[in-house]
């Protein structure tokens, strides 16, 4: 039986410089099974588009943006006429369409979620053209494809859509299999698909990892490679803990928890389609392709109860909702959490007592969150207090929920550094515990927890790494 094909996803920094295309081509030609390539937008492009649609712009600003996007993408094209001219024609058509779209937004001074998603999709659309042209220049028979055209189907939740797995499989798989059988390498846009209404819907920022896993699910492939300009997961952020070391394997749940709570090497939603397809996610460093990286899959579960990694999220705030008998008012927690969710506010953690419900949210959203909670109908609501300058620390490992004494070791190590723990959360997941500290205490707390569990390895850890993963949100 022939070996199965693979999906290889390349992040924004991997497609942002001309010299990177030599590396991408080498990755693909070294292993011809890497037939399906999923790409992010070139680094910085989506940020520029987001800035543009947050507030309608004047025509002069739109002209400057379109000019800059065109120059950036054209500067990355190969020089040979055939590959260059074909890509230029398509890029011109894309930038013209984007320009007209932004003029329309400026004229009406409003933008719907559907229109916003369509605008944001242009980063990946342009990137796919540039990547495919460069791969053809280097001998790879690459053909660019737009995900919403070839069959990546989603629900109608614009801005944070979810792929419809079975519908995507029935539409996407036959098309891509024909492309591969014909010898083509498909370069597919990440980040978006087509909604049930026939409109472009995005998966949220960083959603190209998720796209790659969806493509693998549709094709029933066992391996999704996530190529970035950094390594895989580490035991902690090496910027804070110099002794941090690389992790060769994680379970699905461990990877999802670490990604959600600050480790930015993988989008947390990428785990869902990988798990559904029983596939492995392999995080690879494009600068060190021979390194093992981190494998996440069905065969990497280690339930020893050991702590595997520590991640964190900065710049949070705790909202404390005081209410008489809060703990016995079952509907109050539900109503408050639903109100925050409906307002698009991410809640990292929640805890309740007899007199108070506490929510952990981004500090940038705390004012909005306070207003939202203030409108929750309740005859028992007393007051709302804000505790600013909070950071969340998460420690992860399969089987932690069954291990004895792990939490005690963590909090003892933190207390010995004079750090006060504010909000503790355990039990929602059997693989992760979280707690909050004041932001000024974050770094010493992370170092203390890491030393508590990994001090025995410090003598064996090299003084430096060829590359390090940015393990946390900054």
Enumerate the predicted regions with their spans.
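Residue-level detector of flexible, active-site-proximal loop/helix-junction positions
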Residues: 149-151, 288, 428
């Amino acid at each position: 039986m022939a070996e199965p094909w693979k999906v290889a996803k390349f992040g924004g920094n991997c497609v942002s410089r001309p010299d990177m295309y030599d590396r991408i081509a080498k990755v693909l030609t070294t292993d011809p099974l890497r037939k399906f390539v999923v790409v992010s937008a070139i680094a910085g492009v989506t940020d520029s588009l987001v800035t543009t649609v947050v507030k309608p712009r004047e025509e002069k600003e739109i002209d400057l943006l379109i000019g800059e996007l065109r120059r950036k993408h054209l500067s990355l094209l190969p020089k040979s006429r055939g590959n260059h001219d074909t890509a230029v024609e398509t890029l011109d058509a894309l930038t013209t369409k984007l320009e007209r779209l932004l003029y329309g937004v400026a004229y009406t001074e409003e933008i719907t979620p559907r229109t916003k998603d369509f605008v944001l999709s242009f980063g990946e659309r342009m990137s796919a053209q540039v990547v495919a042209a460069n791969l053809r220049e280097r001998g790879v028979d690459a053909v660019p494809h737009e995900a919403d055209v070839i069959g990546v189907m989603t629900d109608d939740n614009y801005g944070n859509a979810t792929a419809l797995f079975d519908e995507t499989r029935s539409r996407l798989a036959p098309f891509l299999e024909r492309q591969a059988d014909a010898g083509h390498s498909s370069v597919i846009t990440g980040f978006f698909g087509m909604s049930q209404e026939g409109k472009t819907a995005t998966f949220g920022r960083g959603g190209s990892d998720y796209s790659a896993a969806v493509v693998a699910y549709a094709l029933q492939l066992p391996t999704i490679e996530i190529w970035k300009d950094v390594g895989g997961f580490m035991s902690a952020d090496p910027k804070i803990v110099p002794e941090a070391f690389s992790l060769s394997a994680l379970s699905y749940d461990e990877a999802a928890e670490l990604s959600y709570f600050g480790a930015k090497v993988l989008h947390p939603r990428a785990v869902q389609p990988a798990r559904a397809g029983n596939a492995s996610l392999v995080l690879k460093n494009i600068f060190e392709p021979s390194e093992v990286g981190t494998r996440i899959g069905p065969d990497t579960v280690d339930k020893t109860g050991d702590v595997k990694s520590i991640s964190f999220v900065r710049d949070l705030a705790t909202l404390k909702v005081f209410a008489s008998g809060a703990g016995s008012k079952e509907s109050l927690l539900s109503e408050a959490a639903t109100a925050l969710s409906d307002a698009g506010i991410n809640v990292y953690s929640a805890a309740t007592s007899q007199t108070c419900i506490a929510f952990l949210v981004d500090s940038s959203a705390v004012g909005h969150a306070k207003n939202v909670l203030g409108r929750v109908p309740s005859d028992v609501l007393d007051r709302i207090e804000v505790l600013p300058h909070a950071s969340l620390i998460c420690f992860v490992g399969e089987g932690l929920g069954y291990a004895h004494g792990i939490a005690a070791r963590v909090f003892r190590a933190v207390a010995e550094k004079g750090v006060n723990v504010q909000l503790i959360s355990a039990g929602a997941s059997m693989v992760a515990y979280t707690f909050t500290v004041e932001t000024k205490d974050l770094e010493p707390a992370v170092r203390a927890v890491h030393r508590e569990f990994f001090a025995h390895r410090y003598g064996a850890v090299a003084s430096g790494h060829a590359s390090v993963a940015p393990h946390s949100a900054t």
